[in-house]
Regions:
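Acetyl-CoA-dependent GNAT
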Residues: 2-3, 9-10, 18-91, 102-104, ...
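Short secondary-structure boundary/hinge segments and terminal tails
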Residues: 48, 110, 127, 149-150
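C-terminal "cap" of GNAT-fold acetyltransferases
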Residues: 2-6, 115, 122-126, 135, ...
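Residues that form or flank phosphate/diphosphate-binding pockets in enzymes
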Residues: 39, 78, 96, 127, ...
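Short, Lys/Arg-rich nucleic-acid/phosphate-binding segment
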Residues: 75, 143-144
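Short beta-alpha junctions and helix-cap segments that line functional grooves
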Residues: 44, 142-143
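Conserved glycine-rich acetyl-CoA-binding loop
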Residues: 85, 89-103, 110-112, 116, ...
């Protein structure tokens, strides 16, 4: 699945496409900039091979400027998408790229039979919580000491209209 290019920074087109193994080093570099506890190249490779059914990158000027990844969860009662990771290079934020990536992965989850999407976000990451709220996500509960450093994680969900 590829989203047609749309104007990004300074009107340069941004292309959203499925990622491939060759993207891992560049994704890992961006991930290290964005997160306190990045998965790293090996963790990304393992996740892509074993769990992340949906992984997309945003590309501008031949460079990966953002990515998102997730997989499908099936409890037996409900099938939902799990948005595991999303990051945008700082200079490309506030331009709609994150929203486009989330819309792309949500569409993929829907095609795979999901009725909702779940994600976790650090309780201190107010910008991310506000971003997901704008996209229709709602906080449903909190994991105590969810992250390696002991920070709590807010679980947010969005249900697709039936």
């Amino acid at each position: 699945m590829v989203t047609a290019g749309y104007p990004g920074q300074y009107g340069k087109p941004v292309l959203i496409r499925r990622s491939n193994p060759a993207d891992i080093p560049e994704i890992a570099s961006l991930e290290a900039e964005a997160f306190i506890d990045p998965w790293g190249e090996e963790g990304l490779r393992e996740a892509m091979n074993n769990y992340l059914t949906s992984f997309f990158v945003a590309v501008a000027d031949g460079m990966i400027i953002g990515f998102c990844g997730g997989g499908i969860e099936n409890t037996g009662d409900i099938v939902y998408g799990h948005l595991c990771t999303l990051a945008i290079r700082p200079q490309y934020r506030q331009q709609g790229i994150g929203s486009e990536l989330v819309a792309t992965i949500e569409h993929d989850f829907l095609l795979l039979g999901a009725t909702a999407v779940e994600l976790e976000v650090r309780i201190s990451n107010r910008d991310a919580i506000a971003f997901y709220r704008r996209l229709g996500y709602r906080a449903v509960f909190c994991y105590t000491r969810y992250y390696k450093d002991g920070e709590d994680g807010v679980v947010m969900m969005k249900w697709f209209a039936s």
